[in-house]
């Protein structure tokens, strides 16, 4: 089904994988070096066209367009305003697809929307009102273009199937673009994803995506690299099918994606009235990839990602045949994911040897596409979901899709079967809509199934869980009233209905400034919208207290700052910070704020020892070796340790919440994604790396760590950072900071990106 090549591989004429350089020469009659062949990837060409550094090893990228949704654009624009924003220099689309229900906090969600609308007018942007489209579907329909690059403040910013290299990053990276700065990275590796064969009837894009995620996540095969889709199997897939695979590449932890394009993508642009934005893309005659994943589409069967990660993948048939073993494995993994905070079991879902689920949902940027929903309607037509616990909801990804589904009868078929068809909303993907009952088990064609991502509150003793599946198998399960069923078991005649896009919907409702700013527009600030608090520059010496210690193999951004209803407070930095690590380590906020008292005293010109008594013996021990430490040259803050933090969302708040609570650093064995590490840096936090085994650390939660001359070490680009765990003695430890650009070092020295741009 899938094969991962050990090392790099050549692709000759877009069809033949060859690992031996001599064989390439024999096939082509010419000698091609790896260095030359690397420049023949589609990714290289697009990056080269957007790089202004003149150095293809150290890229400085200028994007063509930007996009954000309503739980990120407020913080981004507030940061940009504090840094000197006068006008959006490139198209910037603000969608309102996350806090759309306005069910939490009174007026605060709609207040954010009004902030967005007035900013779009004032600075020259585009505003997509609530329920019109989810962020990524609008981008596909209206923004993507062949050979273009788009940066979004959402991790699933992926439009590679349309020939657009798109990346999801934390808000500060968008701020840089808004201020006419660049996105600075080393040239990423490019991994070929070679598609062969053709999917069998009943297999959908989520099945292919989950198979790829299952093969590449744990081993980091594509981590922070570009996935480039090639091979004869590509042409066997519709545009919608490719889009459905592409959006899920984020769950592999790749940096971006790009696909070869053809007449099916050309037709997509024509349908959306943008034929001029199509560009044919293909790899060169001889292309070298840093790795290669071979995918035989014909062998893929309906898949399921069991709780609590998209990489926890099985075929549905495997689950049904080995039900007891699979459920036991899921429950054992849950002990780690949930820290034993609640009792979790799926055994009660087994009735007469069959697994029954409580809820089915098809939604958002992954599931809400036209073809997915049409296929679901074809499957469920003539069936009904029953009048018991099982519920089934479908969220088309945009109003134009919804309208076409109404016109072609798909909505009627779904509703007659008992399905509820709702508006374009990302809620089921991040815990703000269709939260199941306690102990319920939901199957969803959405992007993630992290703990509590469906909206349950662990700190209240609640637990529900989600398995990811394709829309087709979810509909098959719904047709069987919740009995887990692969779509390949259903005898269905798929209509294959043609899509018609009605552009009048957006023309009549979306505000588009066409790049014309109106500086006289007054921004509407809701009561919950607050400015970022002042942040200090990096001190000469740093005293850190470890205030949380996490030993999970991977820590997600959902654990660092929860999603769901918590997201409504993202316009208020200090208010949101109260929820930091609330599901993983409820005592974290209190510990961090206690340590922060010392730094606030320093900033007020007072003695930190007077407000934090426990600091007295710590400083006494430090001054035995460093007698000058503490005399106007020290900062005090908190740090967390996590094995591998930062998987999941691009949300900058995973870092900024730590910062506004006095965080100065993270310590990790590695960082799960480039975007989380960038968020730390942009908020002035040191991304320390330790080589120590997480089971044998030199420090523990509650310990103080002294980092002498940290400012000088950052300035001098020191390879290693010497620090001391403060106890009865000073125990030396060594950290590294990893590769950093000069600008990133300066941001840390200044204390945060806002300070950096203020000068």
Regions found by a protein language model. Give the residues of each.
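Fe-S-dependent hydro-lyases/dehydratases of central metabolism
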Residues: 1-759
């Amino acid at each position: 089904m899938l094969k991962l090549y050990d090392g790099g591989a050549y692709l000759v004429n877009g069809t033949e994988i060859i690992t031996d350089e001599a064989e390439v020469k024999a096939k082509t009659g010419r000698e091609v070096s790896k260095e030359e062949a690397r420049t023949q990837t589609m990714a290289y060409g697009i990056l080269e066209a957007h790089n202004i550094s003149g150095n293809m090893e150290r890229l400085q990228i200028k994007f063509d367009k930007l996009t954000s949704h309503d739980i990120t654009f407020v913080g981004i624009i507030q940061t940009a305003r504090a840094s000197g924003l006068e006008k959006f220099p490139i198209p910037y689309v603000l969608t309102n697809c996350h806090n759309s229900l306005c069910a939490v906090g009174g007026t605060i969600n709609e207040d954010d929307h009004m902030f967005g609308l007035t900013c779009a007018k004032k600075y020259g942007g585009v505003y997509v009102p609530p329920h019109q489209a989810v962020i990524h579907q609008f981008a596909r329909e209206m923004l993507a273009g062949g050979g273009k690059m788009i940066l979004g403040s959402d991790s699933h910013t992926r439009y590679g199937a349309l020939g657009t290299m798109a990346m999801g990053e934390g808000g500060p990276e968008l701020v840089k673009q808004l201020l006419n700065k660049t996105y600075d990275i080393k040239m990423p590796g490019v991994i070929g994803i070679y598609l062969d064969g053709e999917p069998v009837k009943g297999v959908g894009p989520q099945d292919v995506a989950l198979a790829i995620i299952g093969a590449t996540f744990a081993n980091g095969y594509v981590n922070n690299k570009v996935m480039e889709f090639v091979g004869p199997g590509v042409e066997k897939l519709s545009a919608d099918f490719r889009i459905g695979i592409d959006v899920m590449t984020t769950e592999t932890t790749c940096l971006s994606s790009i696909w070869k394009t053809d007449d099916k993508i050309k037709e997509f642009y024509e349908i959306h009235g943008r034929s001029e934005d199509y560009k044919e893309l293909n790899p060169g005659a001889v292309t070298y990839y840093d790795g290669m994943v071979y995918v035989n589409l014909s062998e893929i069967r309906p898949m399921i990602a069991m709780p609590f990660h998209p990489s926890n993948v099985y075929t549905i048939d495997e689950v049904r045949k080995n039900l007891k073993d699979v459920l036991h494995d899921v429950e054992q993994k849950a002990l780690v994911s949930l820290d034993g905070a609640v009792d979790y079991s799926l055994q009660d879902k087994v009735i007469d040897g069959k697994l029954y689920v409580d809820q089915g949902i098809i939604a958002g940027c992954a599931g809400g596409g036209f073809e997915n929903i049409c296929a679901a309607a074809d499957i469920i037509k003539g069936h009904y979901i029953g009048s018991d616990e099982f519920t089934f909801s479908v969220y088309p990804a945009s109003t134009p899709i919804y309208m076409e589904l109404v016109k072609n009868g798909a909505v009627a078929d779904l509703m007659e079967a008992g399905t509820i068809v709702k508006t374009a909303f990302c809620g089921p993907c991040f815990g703000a809509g269709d939260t199941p009952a306690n102990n319920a088990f939901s199957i969803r064609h959405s992007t993630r199934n992290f703990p509590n991502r469906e909206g349950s509150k662990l700190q209240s003793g609640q637990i529900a869980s989600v398995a990811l599946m394709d829309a087709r198998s979810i509909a098959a399960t719904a047709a069987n009233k919740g009995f887990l069923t692969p779509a390949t078991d259903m005898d269905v005649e798929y209509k294959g209905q043609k899509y018609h896009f009605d552009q009048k919907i957006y023309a009549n409702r979306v505000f588009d400034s066409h790049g014309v700013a109106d500086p006289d527009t007054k921004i509407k600030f809701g009561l919950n919208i607050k400015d970022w608090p002042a942040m200090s520059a990096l001190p000469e010496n740093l005293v850190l207290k470890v205030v949380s210690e996490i030993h999970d193999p991977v820590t997600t951004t959902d654990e660092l700052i929860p999603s769901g209803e918590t997201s409504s407070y993202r316009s208020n930095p200090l208010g949101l910070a109260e929820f930091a690590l609330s599901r993983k380590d409820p005592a974290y906020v209190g510990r961090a704020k206690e340590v922060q008292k010392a730094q606030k005293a320093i900033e007020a010109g007072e003695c930190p020892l007077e407000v934090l008594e426990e600091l007295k013996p710590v400083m006494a021990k430090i001054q035995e070796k460093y007698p000058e430490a503490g005399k106007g040259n020290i900062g005090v803050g908190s740090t967390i340790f996590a094995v591998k933090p930062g998987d999941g969302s691009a949300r900058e708040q995973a870092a900024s919440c730590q910062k506004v609570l006095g965080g100065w650093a993270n310590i990790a064995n590695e960082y799960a994604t480039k975007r989380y590490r960038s968020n730390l840096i942009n908020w002035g936090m040191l991304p320390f790396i330790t080589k120590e085994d997480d089971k044998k650390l030199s420090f523990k939660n509650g310990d103080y760590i002294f980092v002498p001359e940290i400012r000088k070490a950052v300035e001098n680009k020191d390879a290693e950072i010497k620090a001391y765990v403060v106890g009865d003695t000073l125990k030396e430890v060594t950290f590294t900071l990893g590769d950093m650009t000069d600008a990133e070092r300066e941001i840390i020295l200044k204390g945060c990106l806002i300070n950096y741009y203020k000068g």
